[in-house]
């Protein structure tokens, strides 16, 4: 993408390319020449694609520079030229593939008589590989014209880069038909037979190993190709040639005839092991259901693959059988090796790579379960020899792994395929292991010897882990397996003393060791999958019961944790700003989450719910009481009865811890700040009204439309009761006596003179607030000659809190007879027929209620003279003016 979208910085190559005397070495010295080539710089490509420059780059890649040359000429220029030629630029690929002279110059590199330079060989192989991949037709047709191409490849097969070129020729051809043509061409050139000829004692070790690796890669690639391409027109000719018995016999002859070479034996065994490898099942048999099937089903698929491999490698098995004695002799008489000094002592003679590969080959031959081959191996007593090596080389874990796998396979092998199912015969391999090899006796003796050495302070035997698994395989196949009945019978045939020792060993040391080995070293925490990750297609598979139980427990755990998180991390409105002192406190609470399901445990939120419930009920009670008072006003209650209503308000406020006149309910800091700001504005407006004189009317319509409602309730801000009252602004202070002025919804006492409030409001008039304003259209009743009017707002007189409280105390001390006669003693609510408050006349404007500071209330309002009773001094009501 970096090159595609031209995200590189600008280069000065364009300026350099404008020079007429620019040389190719000078251009290759630039650091960004490769980047500019990959982004298809037109000027640069035009310069590089000139025939002299292309020939020079091919010469750098294929011709070895002089030893006395500069380092740039020997290493830098060939490396940069190879990168440019293999940069996969279409113009360069076309130029190389279309010019046969350049291809001949490249091909000339293989015609060198001596050994090839490994660095130049890698450059040559890389350039040829990109041409095989991009210009397949041109290059294949060019190579097929060369009669000595295969001979030259085999001549330089000792160079790893040439071996890679042969593999590129087999793998980089994408079109199936063209690849089949290449395979047939190489098979006609007898590439397989010629590679086997390279595995000969007369060749060097590099040729042995590279030729063997080439044959192994051909086998694996051909089998892989057969699996991927089901409808191939014809079988792979190279693989068919390799699996022929004649080809394997030629390989075995090179290994054992004449002077034996360890390199030849090891290289030949690698080819034989590749031929005996079990094949993978075909792609059509590997479905989703088989992938999610049980372990037994997967083992059956593997067994089928091994069976197919045995059938397809019949030629190899037949060719191998006459040479088994030669391989067994290698185990008994290994090639001469020098003793090795190990950390635990002297090893003489070492096992060696040759005998290790022989053990691998014989174990693979036993796993093939071929009757003739197995009979020959048992006749040579190969399993017993392998067990001798197992216990002799105490610390060779490579050998221990091979012998353990071989013994476990022999114990679980079924009857040979050619045996009759009606009359199954005894498995000769199992009988050979327990009788000729004395497997049980060897296990018991080695275990006791290891215990004795460890008790003396010596090291533990290196094969003890593998020996434990061999003993476990024997016990498992005795309990369940194709040879279970035969194994139980063979164990019963053991001496009685040995039977008792085996039973004690199985129930004692072996059971304890297996119990220790089954403990998980790391406890894995499975992640819970969300519901979005669930797939209905996976529900049809039967997962193990442990996984189902684990998932159920995790679901239960997540449910409990979710409820705990909600309980601990939630905040009420009042507590949201009061976070815990420690930031980690909510997370510390999660550590205390338990999974207790005790039904008797009380929920910590129960008390909180009860408090919130009572608070809500109390608010509803307040609303109902206010509605009762409003109905009482509409039915004609008196001023004295309003005082009793205010008393109930004071009592309820004391119960709730709130000042009188404030409704029950939570308030926020923002509301308190708004009230303080409005009070400051009212102070300024009240001072302006007082400066103009006391005759200024203080009641006027509210500035906006009022919501509908039958009545309204006045609210007063909390004011200290001992605050002194201020004199009137006009300087005149009238002292009156009479019934006390009521608190709460105030009305002008009956029989007192009233003043019309129809004058328009002043510009700087005081803005009054109302909690429950009454709409202008609400009709009100008038008593004793007053007519019914529809004022725009309810009428309200404003007095100071201190005077009202003093008046209220006067009522408590000297109640009037008329008040007591008209009040219901049980509810303190005015009874029916009581004096109704006077209503406003036509044109009157009723002010909205407002809780003013005490000083402003005293200056603006004075109570009217009351004819009866002796009440304390207080400000006059506006109705008396």
UniProtKB/Swiss-Prot annotation:
Residues 621-642, 669-686 have a biased composition (Acidic residues). Its main location: cytoplasm. One of its GO terms (biological process) is regulation of signal transduction. Residues 700-710 have a biased composition (Pro residues). Keywords: Cytoplasm, Phosphoprotein. It is found in: Cytoplasm. The keyword Phosphoprotein applies. Ubiquitous with higher expression in testis. Regulatory subunit of protein phosphatase 6 (PP6). May function as a scaffolding PP6 subunit. Involved in the PP6-mediated dephosphorylation of NFKBIE opposing its degradation in response to TNF-alpha. Belongs to the SAPS family. Protein phosphatase 6 (PP6) holoenzyme is proposed to be a heterotrimeric complex formed of the catalytic subunit, a SAPS domain-containing subunit (PP6R) and an ankyrin repeat-domain containing regulatory subunit (ARS). Interacts with PPP6C and NFKBIE. Interacts with ANKRD28, ANKRD44 and ANKRD52. This is Serine/threonine-protein phosphatase 6 regulatory subunit 1. It comes from Homo sapiens. The lineage of its organism: Eukaryota, Metazoa, Chordata, Craniata, Vertebrata.
